[in-house]
A protein has these predicted regions:
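Predominantly soluble domains enriched in secretory-pathway, periplasmic, or organellar proteins
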Residues: 1-214
Length: 214
């Protein structure tokens, strides 16, 4: 290809779609996979190790993750993951479960005790990252596409709420002292605080929008 043809091809690839793709609550629910119901697996690890000294290594190249003994640095278990995981998995407060987010929207919950992926759901088309509430009740996915936040039941990964952001969401994190999620907006001069300790009467989480400067 000539340089001009390369530029034209790049421009074509990067142009926005005429109709924004839809990935709403209906599509999210339809993608939900439960491999093991809550409470159906043993409450003790199937391997011997110091449970307070473990590592999860995310392998980007071949889409696997490895549970590593933090004392000996020997692999305990290596398992396949979704395509192109983000490198920052999140953990349940008790350390038993690890949550992964893939760049194409899949959220996976892995039971470290039983070395098994127990649930998965596709929360978006282009996902930036994932956070888990300090109390272990909620998980939340920050999406570029669609431009929203998706709140999940951390136990089952069932979708609870979709929050339209009107912006790409750069990142979301949990703020334990505030019992809140904090979300950064890409296209708005705002940071959102989403308290998770005081849901509304219908169970939904409310939003506090905080204006920011350049």
């Amino acid at each position: 290809l000539t340089p001009e043809q390369i530029d034209l091809l790049a421009s074509y690839v990067y142009q926005p779609p005429a109709t924004p793709p839809v990935w709403g609550l209906e599509q999210i629910r339809a993608s939900h996979i439960v491999n093991a119901a809550p409470g159906s697996l043993p409450d003790k690890p199937v391997f011997k190790a110091d449970m307070d000294n473990l590592f999860i290594v995310v392998e980007l190249g071949d889409h696997h993750a490895t549970l590593l003994d933090g004392v000996s640095f020997e692999p305990i278990h290596r398992f396949p993951t979704r395509f192109a995981l983000h490198g920052g998995p999140k953990y349940s407060p008790d350390g038993r479960y690890v949550y992964f987010a893939s760049r194409d929207g899949w959220i996976s919950k892995f039971d470290i005790y039983n070395l098994k992926t127990v649930a998965e759901i596709r929360a978006g088309i282009n996902t930036r990252n994932l956070a888990v509430s300090f109390d272990g009740r909620y998980a939340i996915a920050a999406n570029y596409l669609p431009r929203n936040l998706v709140i999940l039941d951390a136990e089952t990964l069932a979708p609870l709420q979709v929050i339209d952001a009107g912006s790409r969401v750069s990142a979301v994190y949990t703020a334990p002292p505030r019992n809140s999620f904090i979300a950064a907006m890409k296209d708005l001069k705002e940071v959102w605080e989403i308290p998770y300790d005081k849901p509304a009467a219908d169970g939904s989480l409310t939003i506090r929008k905080i204006a920011t400067q350049d």
